[in-house]
């Protein structure tokens, strides 16, 4: 089937880029089939498996694996049809008991914050975890509780679409939770790298697919990081009726510029640090990746989400607080909120490098606007940075 689609472009997939302009991504049948056949060859899903689909099917990630691969194999797909809040997801996982879970970091991090953190933050639990003979048993119990909460039948959780909170990732490795992190983009329909959870290298984004190639382009050979560039079966033909953007995104020798900065090890594992367009250059010449600071801040008490911006050469964190949690504890008062955020700011700055320290936390009145894959539309908040 893939051969007869080789030169036919399917209906363009529209998505929002960081600049705010929509681009139609032209994906061929081969691009889509490359992802589907990879899923079949690696047995991500088997005939008769159950899948809970809660990612937008208009997004390449959900479309390729929750729908195309799932239907090609012959699985039972349950469409959630609701906003995937932790409470709704927990109930759905219990009912469906999926064999594979495909998700984005925001969802899994909320589950960690709501299910796991309340357990490990208890004084008695902290004491027990400090005893070497007990920590292994307790981690095993926590792992079982988390697996049971997600339905108890899945072989692994595949996370992609955005950067994973390093604290959450480290904890999942510590308890030997079966998860892996992949990497992709709509222009690759979407998969670029993936490794099964038992082969996954911590802090990586998986291994480059055998039908893809990746290289790290550095303008200065002495730079530690470079732009990740890819080519192969999954790469789009270009942007719909936009030759200028197409020319800009491809190198002269045919590699796709991802716009992501990172490294590649000898085993073809990709390590991603951040987006070149969101990187902030400090006054001392250091590269600051706001997503890494946000990941730490989002894991702190009563922080629902955050956005780190540069204002007058200083870092400022916009925070949308978890008002529901504050209300439930009777803490939703201005003085309480200020005390909590001051403590969060102190703890945040104690956990980052000197050039990454945040000057202030500014409360934001609403949730940040997001893309279908739940990434914040950063470009909408540039004017706040310039205030």
Task: Name what the model sees in each region.
Residues 1-14, 21, 44-50:
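Conserved pre-ATP/AMP-binding loop-to-beta segment of ANL
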Residues 222-282:
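Conserved ATP-binding/catalytic segment of the ANL
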Residues 261, 300-324:
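C-terminal boundary motif of the adenylate-forming
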Residues 11-36:
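Conserved AMP-binding A3 loop
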Residues 305, 310-316, 345-387:
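Conserved C-terminal "lid"/linker of ANL adenylate-forming enzymes
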Residues 78-80, 157, 164-226, 234-237, ...:
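Conserved ATP-binding loop and adjacent catalytic segment of the adenylate-forming AMP-binding
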Residues 33-50, 57-145, 153, 178:
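Conserved AMP-binding/adenylation subdomain of ANL enzymes
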Residues 235, 269-298, 325-336, 352-358, ...:
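Adenylate-forming
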